[in-house]
Amino acid sequence: MKILLDSLPFIRIFRGQIIVIKYGGAAQINPQLKEKFALDIVIMYMLGLKPVIIHGGGKRINEMLDIMGIESEFYNGYRITSAECMRVVEMVLSGEINKELTAFLNFHGAKAVGMSGKDAHLLQAKAKDNGALGYTGEITAVNPSFLLNVINDGFVPIIAPIATGEGAGHLGYNINADIAACHIAKALSAKKIIFLSDIAGVLDSNKEPISSLTPSDIKQLQKQGVINGGMIPKLEACVDCVQNGVEKAHIIDGRIEHSLLLELFTTQGIGTEIYNGQDK
């Protein structure tokens, strides 16, 4: 009873609010964690929150590329996506993971609907770094009206981070899921964006989690080399969000059962909170 009473102030704050969740890491692979995640989403939905889920799939993509004898290449945390690789990326993200997750959430009681960024021009993109990363793209436009219609009709959108390219015959673009989640959160004026990861949050030089950061803190940590690899695009996304209308961004440990509920409905929360240097 105490847990429920303690959560009431947070339920009042978040009821009716859009919460964007980037779903990835162990929570996307471990069967027990998948089930806890699904239950968290159902509870959020039943309490009147409006979850929007963008999923990754890097490990599954790498596994499929290995099976097909295609090398996985990365630069500064971004995948270099050849035409051959792009076909595999879309097959795994849109054809496998998206449908599996949608079915799984529906089974647990959410009204989930799966889609990719190609649907209704949800995500439009151009080649990142003038094509140096192949079919890895950067988002140029988001169609929020389509998503808002889906949300306001009582559905939970499950989005694969594939964007529409130039022309009908274009393969489309592979979008970093963290960046896609950020653009969607901004377009929807989301209350929060939450990134599920396989670490306890952003770690300092002693590998201890940092409870809160501002964009200037993040810049300093990058200069010191504390932040690197796949954490770079994740934190770039967080900074972009909090500087463009999203109240707070959170990086939390998806390996902890019910991590979403712990972040949203408890005073202490978990992981690292990023805010824009004003009031926390």
From Swiss-Prot:
Q: Does the keyword Amino-acid biosynthesis apply?
A: yes
- Keywords, alphabetical: Amino-acid biosynthesis, Arginine biosynthesis, ATP-binding, Cytoplasm, Kinase, Nucleotide-binding, Transferase
Q: Name one Pfam family in it.
A: AA_kinase
Catalytic activity entry: N-acetyl-L-glutamate + ATP = N-acetyl-L-glutamyl 5-phosphate + ADP
* Example of a GO cellular component annotation carried by this entry: cytoplasm
Q: Which GO terms describe its biological process?
A: arginine biosynthetic process via ornithine; L-arginine biosynthetic process
Compartments, record wording: Cytoplasm
UniProt binding sites for substrate: G57, G58, R79, N174
Q: What's a single GO MF annotation on this record?
A: ATP binding
InterPro entries this protein is in? Answer: AceGlu_kinase-like_sf, AcgluKinase_fam, ArgB, Asp/Glu/Uridylate_kinase, Glu/AcGlu_kinase, NAGK-C
Annotated positions for site Transition state stabilizer: K22, K234
Q: Does the keyword ATP-binding apply?
A: yes
The biological pathway it contributes to is:
Amino-acid biosynthesis; L-arginine biosynthesis; N(2)-acetyl-L-ornithine from L-glutamate: step 2/4
List the EC numbers from the record: 2.7.2.8
Identify its protein family.
Belongs to the acetylglutamate kinase family. ArgB subfamily.
Q: What does this protein do?
A: Catalyzes the ATP-dependent phosphorylation of N-acetyl-L-glutamate.
- What name is this protein filed under? Acetylglutamate kinase
Q: Which organism is it from?
A: Helicobacter hepaticus (strain ATCC 51449 / 3B1)
Q: Which gene encodes it?
A: argB
